[in-house]
Structures are given as structure tokens and as C-alpha cells.
Amino acid sequence: RVQTIASRLEPQTRVFRADAPAWKWEVNVISSKDLNAFCMPGGKIMVYSGLIEQLALSDDEIAVVVGHEIAHALREHSREQASQAIAAQTAIDVGSKLLQLSDTLASVANVGYQALIATRFSRTDESEADRIGLELTARAGYDPRAGITLWQKMLSANQGARPPEFLSSHPAEASRVQQIQGVLPSVVPLYEAARRPG
């Protein structure tokens, strides 16, 4: 089921990257109770069975999840985050040596970077992946409004189990619902066009 949905989304990637439909896309479902999905560089996508089963996801909601992960691959977010982390660590190392800071203070600087700066970059990437993923979903003929029901289900499932948004690498579910509502006017017409016969 997940692979069938992904096979409809993959051709839509050409809108964002002309070379992407030719990538060796690979979608796997991992047997796990976790509510998660992730993407590795080059289009290797993993969806945990718990996400699908525990939240009783519809095909449209699965398309939103897979579209989101495809968007991460298209924008090379994991490579970008790795580059930012290396640059930050190098700056912290050089700065601590120049300022003759102790290892403890250098560690505090690193924790501060992770908590306050790296998470903001991650939230920006997540918001971009949500927006692009909804467009891919709509262009493939899946209802992008399922993004709202998906995140409402996630909010219900994760109630109270998250750090404050400013310390999280992902936007809070309620924030995501608001962002998705803002994107829907531009993607629902794409969905309606994809659903038209002819």
C-alpha cells in the first residue's frame, strides 16, 4: 500500500528537480510500534508500521507522510544539516582554542548551539518539507487536506510527550496544522486538477 502511494508521488518530483524521477526511490515499511518515518539522502524512505496502524492512516494521510519525506530528499536536508553541524563544531572548536575556554565551556557552547540554533534550522526544514510534500500529494491526486487530520492524530497520540517547541527539531503539531491550513489554498486546486478525468 505504501509503495503504491509512493509510486504515484515519485513522478511529481520533476516539478522540484528535473533529475529526481530517475532516482532509485526506495520505500520500506519497518515493523515497529513507533510513530515515525524518515528519509535518507538519495530517496531511501522508511515508514514505521506503527504510524500507519496505530493512527489508522488513510491513503491520503500516508501520501502526506511519504510526500513530506520525499521533500526532505529533494531539498537534501540531511546533507545540509550535516554541513551546518560540521561548520558549527569547527567554529566552536576554533573559538574555544582562541579564547582558551575549558572543555566544559566548549561543551556548553555546543549544547547551546544544538538547543537554540540547530533546532531552528530543523524546524525550517520541516516546514519546507511540509509545504513541498503537500504539493506533491496534491499533484499525485491525493487530498492534501489530509495533512490536517494526520497532524491532529499525531497531536492526540503525542499529547504531553514532547519537549517545548523551541527545544524541538520539529514544529509542534498545533503549529503544523496552522501552517498546513495556510498552504491549502495553493495546493487544493492542484489536487482538484489531478482528480479531473481526462
Where do the model's predicted regions map?
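A Zn2+-metalloprotease active-site environment signal
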Residues: 1-198
